Curated annotation (Swiss-Prot):
The keyword Lyase applies. Pathway: Amine and polyamine metabolism; carnitine metabolism. Its EC number is 4.2.1.149. HAMAP family: CaiD. This is Carnitinyl-CoA dehydratase. Disulfide bonds: none annotated. The keyword Lyase applies. GO terms for biological process: carnitine metabolic process; fatty acid beta-oxidation. The lineage of its organism: Bacteria, Pseudomonadati, Pseudomonadota, Gammaproteobacteria, Enterobacterales. Homotrimer. GO terms for molecular function: hydro-lyase activity; L-carnitine CoA-transferase activity.
């Protein structure tokens, strides 16, 4: 792996640190590498949760590397599997990703955070989509995901002016799960990751699948889809060894031993 990504495995949790000069910005090469990492995470049955953060204390990720852009890298460059940063278009990822925001998450950095399942941020975190001021648009998910998280007036202001949102505002609007001090950030992210990793992995995969497949449906339509047999993980949960193990472990007052099947 390149010097831009530092990977650590802690039990069933994969930790990814983005470490690039000039604000942890991402060029096409780094994006390809991140896509490879997230696909390996997806396909490795020993891994259940990933945490992604940025190196240093100021920047989570400043988004697309504008130096690379100035040198000729096009906005519609091939950013590899999973889209920009390897995650923004990785729609078949059945495992949760936690973004630990250690500072500025601007442009594609905010889009990367929005593609994660949960966000823990330090109290100095800041979020923005300044693309319109650069003559481009946040087309790596920002213009698509932000309207699903915030009221239209707030979305329009952030998209059209590049207005920054601080950590407390992100918490208030539900963008962030929690805000902690910078020194507590990784401990808080790891605590959350461990809690998720203690859940049955097949059930977690089914939850992601159901949420993704039914979020735009009515409750009635969602029920019909769940019972239609077209989902991949939900039917497997119903007839899994883990579905037997959970109640048995509860009755025997012991920790369950998940098999993922």
């Amino acid at each position: 792996m390149s010097q831009s990504l530092h990977l650590t495995t802690r039990g069933s949790v994969l930790e990814i640190i983005l470490d690039r000069p000039k604000a942890n910005a991402i060029d096409a090469k780094t994006s390809h590498e991140m896509g490879e990492v997230f696909m390996r995470f997806r396909d490795d049955p020993s891994l259940r949760v990933a945490i992604i953060t940025g190196a240093g204390e100021r920047f989570f990720c400043a988004g697309w590397d504008l130096k690379a852009a100035a040198e000729g890298e096009a906005p519609d460059a091939d950013f590899g599997a999973g889209g920009f940063a390897g995650l923004t278009e990785l729609f078949d990822l059945n495992k949760p990703v936690i973004a630990a925001i250690n500072g500025y998450a601007f442009g594609g950095g905010f889009e990367l955070a929005l593609a994660a399942d949960m966000i823990i941020c330090s109290d100095n975190a800041s979020f923005a989509l300044p693309e319109a001021q650069l003559g481009i648009v946040p087309d790596s998910g920002g213009v698509l995901r932000l309207p699903k998280r915030l009221p239209p007036a707030i979305v329009n202001e952030m998209l059209m002016t590049g207005r920054r949102m601080n950590a407390q505002e992100a918490l208030r609007w539900g963008i962030a799960n929690r805000v902690v001090s910078a020194t507590e950030l990784m401990d808080s992210a790891r605590e959350l990751a461990d809690q998720i990793a203690n859940s049955a992995p097949l059930a977690v995969a089914a939850l992601k699948e159901i949420y993704r497949a039914t979020s735009e449906l009515s409750i009635e339509e969602g029920y019909k889809l769940m019972r239609s047999g077209v989902l991949k993980y939900y039917p497997r949960v119903l007839h899994s060894e883990d579905a037997l193990e959970g109640p048995l472990a509860f009755a025997e007052k012991r920790s369950p031993e998940w098999k993922g099947r």
